[in-house]
A protein has these predicted regions:
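A short, hydrophobic beta-strand-centered structural micro-motif
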Residues: 133-154
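Bacterial Sec-dependent N-terminal signal peptides
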Residues: 1-23
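Surface-exposed short loop/turn segments
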Residues: 150-191, 201-219, 236-275
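Short secondary-structure boundary motifs at beta->alpha junctions and helix caps
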Residues: 111-128, 189-209, 213-215, 227-235
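Compositionally biased alpha-helical segments
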Residues: 20-121, 125-140, 169, 232, ...
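Extracytoplasmic low-complexity/disordered linkers and repeat tracts associated with LysM-containing
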Residues: 83-86, 95, 103, 184-191, ...
Length: 275
């Protein structure tokens, strides 16, 4: 009877303590805290028994469960679409609003170029091709949003007796981000001690190409080491017949396979590897 009373009191105490805190659920962690203020782009909070005020951007918050049981979700985080593979490139968002990428994880720089074939080329279609290419490269990198930093578009120029004409051209550049990185510990737990794998598919995008190419790609892939570089999973490994490449970034994984990204000068690669 005495043990039952002690157990009951322990449960009641823990429940009371939990009820005195708020919980922020971000894309990467659960934060037990006391929410102090919700601003236009961030949530300010402090940890239990601390006065220091911390901030987290709404872009990375899934929801807040307040101590009174109320749940608040944020449209900023739910608006991002998941990239499961290179074919999900249409899920990539392009923005020129800097506040929309606050708190997100930077993946890398991206750029694309599209040019018409003749001086009669449709300028809007050329621009659409450039945006499509930019999204494809971002998806290959595992990003789901691009902050566009530069856009240069030139229309068709008809030639003359002393001057040759030129077709419409669009050049884009920006920075690729994601709202959720693959979890390092989950990836290591999934592959365990296994180090020898086989690839199944390769996606390739040349800077001068208008479309991504996907081919059956059956090579051996050996993992030498796995490191966590500011949340990004990096593999030092050996890809059969590709000895120039040693560093690969894990962009996605599930129970069946994982995908890595690497680049060579102006060519981007995404390789799918069987678990």
């Amino acid at each position: 009877m005495k043990n039952q009373i002690i157990t009951f009191l322990a449960i009641a105490l823990s429940t009371t303590c939990f009820g005195q805190t708020d919980t922020i659920f971000s894309n990467s962690e659960k934060i037990v805290c006391s929410v102090k203020e919700i601003t236009s782009d961030a949530v300010k909070y402090s940890f239990p028994d601390e006065d220091l005020i911390n901030s987290i951007y709404k872009n990375v918050i899934q929801k807040i469960v307040f101590k009174n049981g109320r749940v608040q979700t944020f449209a900023e985080a739910t608006s991002f679409k998941k990239i499961n593979g290179v074919d999900d490139f249409e899920n990539v968002t392009i923005t020129q609003v800097e506040s929309e990428i606050k708190g997100l994880f930077k993946i890398g720089d991206v750029s694309s170029k599209a040019k018409g074939t003749t001086t009669l080329s449709n300028q809007e279609r050329v621009k659409e091709r450039a945006y499509r290419k930019l999204k494809i490269v971002a998806a290959m990198m595992g990003a789901n949003i691009i902050y566009l930093t530069n856009q240069r578009t030139e229309g068709n120029k008809m030639g003359g007796y002393y001057q040759s004409g030129s077709s419409a051209e669009t050049n884009l550049s920006g920075v690729a981000y994601t709202n959720q990185l693959p979890n390092f510990n989950d990836f290591k737990l999934l592959i365990g001690e296994k180090r020898n794998f086989s690839t199944t598919e390769q996606a390739k995008m040349w800077s001068s190409a208008s479309e991504m190419t996907k081919t059956v790609f059956q090579k051996s892939f050996i993992i030498n080491s796995i490191t966590n570089e500011n949340g990004i999973i990096m593999i030092n490994g050996d890809l059969q017949e590709e000895s120039r490449y040693k560093n690969f970034r894990v962009v996605s994984f599930d129970k069946e396979s994982f995908s890595v990204y690497y680049e060579d000068k102006s060519t981007s690669y995404n390789v799918k590897i069987k678990m």
